């Protein structure tokens, strides 16, 4: 049989149940240019609708009339390296997503096309005969008439509008099969490449000077020629700006072939470092010892993984800088991940000071154009150091030598939307591909990571002391039950009040932490007990004092707060303090004292995290009040007091990680204190002062916490002694959701019951969100291909089975909630 060239293509329109590499013929004109990593337009499904695809591999196959040909090539060069193609396929298998879901995570939004489907009248179509052929079918006639009414070329969106609530797909499919219509695809890039135009003389210097003498009546043209005679080549816009000449004068000179215009790529960038890179500060003896061990791993010919435990303020970042310097010297690239966008400006400023323009930044807060151009700089090898949040793990770095995850225990490294990946898992895969060093750093490592270090899966390094022998903050535990007995029902304990007063007297700054924005979590009637709840979600509305609004932080629903209870007219009471209420309490306790609030609402008004942080440092605002975004990575030398206002908030929830999250949160926020020359203090407010986790966090004793927590997890069989796999079902009808969940539970018990503990159906903590009920089946199991295969099979079955058409089903590794 005749062998022909074919391409294995991942198709955008393929759902998870039907996702696989599809085989397409490669037309003769594309055989020399098409390569893996290029996007193409292909006909897909019964209607041969034009659809975007990604070429995963090239092959030879027997000629088959059923094979469809590729319509056209979209990228002249591959936009994906072979390593990133392998990563996308691995993510498809690992995270229960389509290959294109993985590609959308790997590539920046600016690289994608907006593809529209256009239906065209067949060449030399006899309209009357075609309408007769449609017979009595109103839908076929409507589709054909709509295309003809638009000049024989009509976008699918226009046809859908003409059909109203009806679907035109069946009618269009019939018209295409009868060869009355053809289908085309039109694509438009989301972000275009930016080019700068440069002007230079297109003639000799002598000829240009002769033209200057001839053109005394065209002063703008003369000015342009004189400037180019002097400087040779410059930006066309700058030449016009400097000379005051209009662009028409430049165009005239170009048309007369006196001036030549050429273009160069221009990178839109979030930051530009203009100074000379400075030397990296020397390491202390303790840091040098850690660096020496990590440097040996960096130079290893095999992939390596290490955990660096360092108390807050121990100088982990300085170790990172020296390791990156070594990687660059060896011709390798480095990626540093940080958990919050708010930390990125500080890291960029610090790293750019040492590595200059070799640093690129990637995070979701950048404009599409800047993120796309930073991606291009990395891909072109112009940036060899990448700093960013979770998505920066996909940076197209060639010859990756070092990948660092700072504060590796943070939940923000886990994606909660498809694909539901953890950056740490992706980092492990990429480091294995590049034979690179994966370095996890934290003052409160993930319990699983610490266990892996203890059992030899990771190398383990420690920095147990603060930089320059600075002391850890002294911590006081404030018993809020005793405060109530003493008549203090406010949010600020007497102990914290005294410490704040002392800090104000000294002219030092303080940070107050509460992980709840808004003014009050619950608004209820003192007479009848009625509460304000979200009509779309099973949660109460949070009161925001600034605009007198009640807001749902899940779906965004909002309404005005009433003066009195809308049910009985009784007095409204406000419970569950948020950052806005704390700010009001501080102003009442310390009249005239300036405060700065750092939460999502304040940032929305200020514009950026960076603006608020710079203002806090520059103006030395006495008190900052903030949510979780202030707990890590921030370094203000004048902050000597931290107050944790509700240490119990994350402790008593139904999650095996509650102790770990509470310990980490308290330890991290307490670590913001005393990072300068003055000693730091911290006050932890709690209703359970005897709780062991809170006491361990107050002592900053991670080892003691780890020992007690790992013993508890071994007893309960939770990670690292098992893997957690969850299958979640959501839908508008609760009965349908529970029925599907029960079916999934029974399926797992029959297929993998011996390998896994199967629990559920159980509602999620917020059971109804955006008018969709959410239930889950959870498996505690050893990591096995059989369990994962069973999960993939049941997800595919439920999403295609007609009896479950009213629900959506997805699987998730180690879910956060």
Predicted ranges, named:
Residues 1-442, 454-470, 780, 788-792, ...:
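Accessory, non-ATPase domains that flank or precede helicase/AAA+ motor cores in DNA-metabolism machines
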Residues 5-7, 197, 723-725, 773-775:
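Short beta-strand micro-motifs in enzyme catalytic cores
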Residues 15, 590-593, 748-757, 801-806:
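Short secondary-structure junctions
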Residues 182, 596, 752-764, 805-813:
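Short beta-strand elements
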Residues 702-704, 710, 745-750, 784, ...:
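Surface-exposed amphipathic alpha-helical segments in non-transmembrane regions
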Residues 747-784, 790-794:
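C-terminal structured "cap/appendage" subdomains that terminate the fold
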